[in-house]
């Protein structure tokens, strides 16, 4: 299929509209916020200034109560309270792994739930953000792929995940305090539930807010979007977001990738690589990260490693090797440590960085490929769970 093939409506799930009521200012672009303020009575000449003030309160200071926005007049604050709200997703549960990883189950409009993961590391902290409720891609090794797509998240629900994580980490700076460059949440990866490029506009708007210099202030180099290979949107990502790009590659032949990542049947390896070769030039990114989950006897041979090196020749790249994180009923097994190291060594000797990802948060089902909303898991009957885990009749 050509790279410019249109994305059909069957992969777009329109976010459910909230009931009539106050407008949530979270997730609006600056232009949309300006229009919303004008529509509710803010004089047009003042609107740009008001957007700047409110924007700073929400995204720089983490303030959600209009009464605390003290550089606005009391009358204007009362007007805002009548017409608008500043709302973020509700944290339903918070789990902390033995390794310090935190997993949040957050509830969004309609009662739906998604998972968000914070991964602390030396000198950095990464938040893994979801973009959809469920997923449409049905990647055979991924737990999220077993949960049907319900809908896209709104920009408010995406940036709201960042905001609730900052709440939990105590990351909002004290108003008036000297600027502190030390951050617990320093990076965002769009690697949670869903395919970000099947929700492009909302992901773009949320990440623009994250990168805004008067708000959360994350550099585009600290934001990584991971795609399974929605080729028509890759060039658009380079132009309209400009963040780092990771691709869920996972196989070196179309036959294997068709099974592991079924979107490959639509945009195969050759077409995907063509789009990836152009990305660093357009986005000014240093390199592309190729994510490669290590599956015993499926994609982990020396031949696979050598073929991978040939496929990506000429692309500035890092190959991130991911030991498979098993989940109940998973049809695959993790490659042995020796096999993973041998695979990595072939890639390294060819001149590519080939770090082996250390699994994080496995004890709370927060590792790569394990995310699935708790309510979805809870819907399974005891019989289904027993069958999946091999405990039937025990």
UniProtKB/Swiss-Prot annotation:
Cofactor note: Binds 1 [4Fe-4S] cluster. The cluster is coordinated with 3 cysteines and an exchangeable S-adenosyl-L-methionine.
EC code(s) of this entry: 2.1.1.192
Family annotation (InterPro entries): Aldolase_TIM, Methyltransferase_A, RlmN_N, RNA_MTrfase_RlmN, rRNA_lsu_MTrfase_RlmN/Cfr, rSAM
Binding locations of S-adenosyl-L-methionine: 194-195, 226, 248-250, 325
Residues that hold [4Fe-4S] cluster according to the record: 135, 139, 142
Top EC class, one word: transferase
Family: Belongs to the radical SAM superfamily. RlmN family.
HAMAP family, per database record: RNA_methyltr_RlmN
Protein's name in the database: Dual-specificity RNA methyltransferase RlmN
Organism: Roseobacter denitrificans (strain ATCC 33942 / OCh 114) (Erythrobacter sp. (strain OCh 114))
Upper lineage: Bacteria, Pseudomonadati, Pseudomonadota, Alphaproteobacteria, Rhodobacterales
Gene name of the encoded protein: rlmN
């Amino acid at each position: 299929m050509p790279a410019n093939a249109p994305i059909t409506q069957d992969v777009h799930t329109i976010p459910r509209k909230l009931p009539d009521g106050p407008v949530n200012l979270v997730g609006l672009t600056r232009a949309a916020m300006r229009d919303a303020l004008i529509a509710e009575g803010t004089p047009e000449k003042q609107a740009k200034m008001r957007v700047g003030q409110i924007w700073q309160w929400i995204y720089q200071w983490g303030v959600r109560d209009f009464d605390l926005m003290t550089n606005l007049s009391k009358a204007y604050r009362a007007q805002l309270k009548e017409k608008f709200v500043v709302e973020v997703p509700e944290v339903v549960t918070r789990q902390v792994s033995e390794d310090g990883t935190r997993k949040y189950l957050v509830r969004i409009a309609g009662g739906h739930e998604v998972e968000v993961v914070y991964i602390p590391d030396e000198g950095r902290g990464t938040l893994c953000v979801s973009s959809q409720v469920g997923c449409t891609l049905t990647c055979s090794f991924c737990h999220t792929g077993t949960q049907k797509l319900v809908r896209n998240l709104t920009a408010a629900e995406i940036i709201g995940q960042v905001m609730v994580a900052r709440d939990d980490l105590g990351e909002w700076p004290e108003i008036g305090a000297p600027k502190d460059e030390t951050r617990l949440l320093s990076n965002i990866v769009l690697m949670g539930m869903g395919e970000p490029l099947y929700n492009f506009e909302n992901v773009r708007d949320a990440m623009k807010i994250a990168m805004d210099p008067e708000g959360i202030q994350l550099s585009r180099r600290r934001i990584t979007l991971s795609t399974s290979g929605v080729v028509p949107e890759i060039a658009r990502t380079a132009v309209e977001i400009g963040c780092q790009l990771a691709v869920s590659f996972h196989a070196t032949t179309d036959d294997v990738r068709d099974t592991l990542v079924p979107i490959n049947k639509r945009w195969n390896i050759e077409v995907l690589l063509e789009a990836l070769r152009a990305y660093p030039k357009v986005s000014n990114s240093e390199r592309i990260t190729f994510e490669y989950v290590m599956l015993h006897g499926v994609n982990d041979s020396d031949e696979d490693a050598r073929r991978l090196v040939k496929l990506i020749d000429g692309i500035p790249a890092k190959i991130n090797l991911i030991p498979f994180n098993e989940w109940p009923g998973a049809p695959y097994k993790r490659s042995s440590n020796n096999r993973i190291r041998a695979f990595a060594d072939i890639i390294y000797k060819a001149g590519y960085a080939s770090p082996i990802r250390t699994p994080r948060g496995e004890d709370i089902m927060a590792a790569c490929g394990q995310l699935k909303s708790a309510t979805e898991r809870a819907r399974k009957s005891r019989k289904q769970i027993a069958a999946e885990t091999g405990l039937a009749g025990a």
